Regions:
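Cysteine-centric segments in proteins
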Residues: 1-160
Length: 160
């Protein structure tokens, strides 16, 4: 799991299960009854490389077939899996561009996410996402803005 987010570090990795919640697929801050539509979010603490990391794994039940697993952004993001995917693409584009201009050829990886402005239903919220490349960590402000029709606009700016 850690290798999906960060490059190998040569140290033994230890993972601890920290909990699971059945949450709304578009708002991870909302717990929902397991009998209702949603997604399971497993929180895994990873230790052994760099600093401790909080990993989010989304589990999609598929009836009698094995569940589908998807790694989410590390840390405390409350964005749903689809919004996280959009934000990751934007953060990686910015982080890799900055790294390339500085002569770094290593791809960036996400180190952490946290909520800056709390999420309230129907309102915009902000998160801080950290990405690392060539041992340089950059922070990005990720802004999520709900729009008419149920869509959410995602924007990213450097926040160093």
């Amino acid at each position: 799991l850690d290798r999906m987010i960060a490059p190998p570090c040569g140290m033994k990795r230890i993972f601890e299960f920290s909990g699971a919640d059945h949450v709304d697929e578009s708002d991870l801050s909302l717990r929902v009854d397991p009998a209702r539509p949603g997604v399971w979010r497993f929180v895994i603490l990873g230790r052994g490389c760099w600093s401790d990391r909080v990993h989010n794994v989304f589990v999609y039940p598929r009836g009698t077939r094995p569940a589908e697993l998807r790694a989410g952004a590390p840390g405390r993001s409350v964005a749903g899996p689809r919004l996280q995917q959009q934000a990751m693409q934007l953060v990686f584009r910015e982080a890799n561009g900055i790294a390339m201009r500085a002569g770094c050829e290593d791809p960036a990886f996400l180190a952490d996410t946290s909520v800056r402005k709390a999420r309230r239903p129907g309102q915009a919220w902000e998160e801080i996402w950290s990405a690392t490349a060539c041992e340089v960590t950059r922070k990005f402000l990720v802004m999520f803005t709900p729009e008419a029709g149920g869509k959410t606009r995602v924007a990213v700016v450097l926040f160093d």
